[in-house]
UniProtKB/Swiss-Prot annotation:
Molecular function via GO: toxin activity
Family: Belongs to the conotoxin T superfamily.
Tissue: Expressed by the venom duct.
Segments crossing the lipid bilayer: none
PTM annotation, UniProt: Contains 2 disulfide bonds that can be either 'C1-C3, C2-C4' or 'C1-C4, C2-C3', since these disulfide connectivities have been observed for conotoxins with cysteine framework V (for examples, see AC P0DQQ7 and AC P81755).
Comment text on domains: The cysteine framework is V (CC-CC).
A GO CC annotation given for this chain: extracellular region
Compartment annotation: Secreted
Name of the protein: Conotoxin Cl5.3
Organism: Californiconus californicus (California cone)
UniProt keyword terms in alphabetical order: Disulfide bond, Neurotoxin, Secreted, Toxin
C-alpha cells in the first residue's frame, strides 16, 4: 500500500489504490 498516495501499488504490494484520477482511496 502506497503511503505517498500513489495510484499504483509498489513492488510486492496488493493493488489497493485506485487508478487515476481518483487516488484518495489508497490505504494510508
Amino acid at each position: 500500500n502506497s503511503e505517498d498516495g500513489s495510484p499504483y501499488p509498489g513492488p510486492g504490494q496488493q493493488p489497493n489504490c485506485c487508478k487515476w484520477p481518483i487516488v484518495t482511496c489508497c490505504n494510508r
